[in-house]
């Protein structure tokens, strides 16, 4: 008398269903992308309420002022040189108002701007001519690309 053992058939069905060891039977879809964790940093304001920070622009470190009143990132001529933008080769054809009057600035795109662990790529910026700006301002062309920023109790929080 012959007894049929269903176990080998069940095992084969499970292997075929899962596609174990059979690459042609696996789903063709790419795996789901990894979930990005939110980056956040908190910056204490100075006694005058301003937020001076160390930033990395195109991987070069500079000092800057976070300025919600500035419509764009504005780099001083000297800082533009430090971060490798070659300001002497730029075209200064954009009129901008500064505390010292109207000057012509050059449009640039920054590959990367980082403040602590908060990073933003492809940031529009302006380079001001030599002597027109004492330091770099990180304005709204940077801040608006963040998921949020807020000032509370003398601390500015940036999230991305």
Set out the residue ranges of the language-model regions:
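Pepsin/retropepsin-fold aspartyl endopeptidases
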Residues: 1-63, 68-160
């Amino acid at each position: 008398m012959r007894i049929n053992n269903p176990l080998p058939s069940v095992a084969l069905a499970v292997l075929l269903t899962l596609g174990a060891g059979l690459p042609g039977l696996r789903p063709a879809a790419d795996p789901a992308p990894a979930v990005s964790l939110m980056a956040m940093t908190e910056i204490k304001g100075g006694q005058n309420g301003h937020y001076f920070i160390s930033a990395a622009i195109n991987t070069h470190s500079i000092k800057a002022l976070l300025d919600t009143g500035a419509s764009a990132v504005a780099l001083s001529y000297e800082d533009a040189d430090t971060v490798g933008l070659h300001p002497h080769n730029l075209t200064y054809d954009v009129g901008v108002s500064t505390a010292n009057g109207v000057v012509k600035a050059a449009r640039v795109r920054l590959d990367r701007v980082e403040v602590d662990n908060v990073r933003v790529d492809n940031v529009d910026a302006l380079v001001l001519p030599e002597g027109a700006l004492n330091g770099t301002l990180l304005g709204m062309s940077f801040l608006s690309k963040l998921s949020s920023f807020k000032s509370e109790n003398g601390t500015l929080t940036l999230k991305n």
